[in-house]
């Protein structure tokens, strides 16, 4: 996701061992670098993909990131999640897991959780999402060695775990039906992602993969049945299901307490108060005026 410390994390992992260019055919910046770590002797290339909110191809950045994940077959995805805004960030996570590429979540800005009164049961969250989660602070360099270890470990696994079911029984049934009619050229771990995208009538996927007449009819029948029942378009139905899943797991893994204020925060709240702000401002201006006037009167002529 944008604004979750992605660039800071990339710089921390690669240092000066990076080069910048453009993705083929577009003006979107491409950044790659060699992993800067004593933890592994292997040469590991880290690619900094454009920050995106979802895997739907609505922006150039989303198209670039999606094409890379699906076509370049990276060994592992490090998914940066803002620990202080976890519910919104997990939407992309659910989509990345469906691609069949192994995912390791970097729960970034974890150092800010205590200050904001947030507690996250990382172990349980990892179990519910079925992927490793490492708490990090890219800015402070915390948790990076653990993140590297886990990413390399996951990348070396010989077998790829199949994405788990996260939707309602009804929608999962439709996904299963579509998976069963996909071409044999689609690998087992990617079938779920393509099935969901065919149900959503994703134009890029429909154009890139031609289905047989019978398969296309199956997809259309499943889509129409769901849209008719819910009186909504398929993409909105899937989006709603994702957020229901996210809200369910967040409700059992994230506790939000009272935010702990620093001295600076407390002062800010007082001086920006709608009732106290103006009197405080007038008092400060009077003190400044008095100090300047007094100094002027006491200076020798």
Briefly describe each language-model feature range.
Residues 281-290:
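Hydrophobic core segments of alpha-helical transmembrane domains in multi-pass membrane transport
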Residues 270-274, 278:
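Loop-to-transmembrane-helix entry motif
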Residues 114-257:
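Alpha-helical transmembrane helix bundles of large polytopic membrane transport and channel proteins
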Residues 295-301:
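Conserved small/polar residues in nucleotide/adenosyl-binding loops
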Residues 45-57:
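Switch II (G3) loop of P-loop NTPases
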Residues 1-47:
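Conserved G1/Walker A P-loop phosphate-binding module
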Residues 68-72, 76-132:
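Conserved C-terminal guanine-recognition region of P-loop GTPase G domains, centered on the G4
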Residues 256-269:
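Cytosolic juxtamembrane amphipathic/interface segments immediately preceding
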């Amino acid at each position: 996701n944008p604004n979750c410390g992605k660039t800071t994390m990339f710089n921390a992992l690669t240092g000066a061992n990076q080069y910048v260019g453009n993705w083929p055919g577009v003006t979107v910046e491409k950044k790659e670098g060699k992993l800067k770590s004593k933890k592994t002797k292997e040469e590991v290339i880290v690619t900094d993909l454009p920050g995106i909110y979802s895997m739907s191809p609505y922006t150039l950045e989303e198209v670039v990131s999606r094409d890379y994940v699906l076509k370049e077959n990276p060994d592992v995805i490090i998914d940066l999640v803002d620990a202080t805004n976890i519910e919104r960030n997990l939407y992309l996570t659910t989509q990345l897991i469906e691609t069949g590429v192994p995912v390791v979540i970097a729960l970034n800005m974890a150092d800010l959780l205590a200050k904001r009164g947030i507690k996250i049961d990382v172990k349980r969250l990892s179990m519910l999402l079925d992927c490793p989660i490492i708490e990090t602070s890219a800015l402070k360099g915390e948790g990076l060695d653990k993140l590297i270890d886990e990413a390399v470990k996951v990348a070396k696994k010989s077998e790829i775990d199949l994405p788990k079911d996260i939707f309602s029984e009804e929608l999962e049934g439709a996904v299963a039906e579509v998976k069963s009619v996909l071409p044999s050229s689609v690998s087992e771990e990617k079938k779920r992602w393509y099935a969901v995208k065919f149900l959503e009538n994703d134009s890029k996927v429909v154009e890139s993969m031609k289905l047989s007449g019978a398969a296309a009819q199956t997809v259309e029948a499943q889509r129409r049945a769901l849209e008719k029942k819910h009186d909504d378009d398929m993409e909105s139905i899937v989006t709603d299901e994702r957020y229901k899943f996210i809200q369910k797991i967040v409700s059992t893994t994230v506790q939000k307490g009272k935010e702990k204020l620093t001295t600076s925060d407390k002062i800010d709240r007082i001086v920006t108060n709608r009732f106290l702000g103006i009197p405080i401002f007038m008092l400060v201006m009077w003190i400044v005026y008095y100090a300047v006037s007094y100094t002027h009167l006491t200076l020798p002529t």
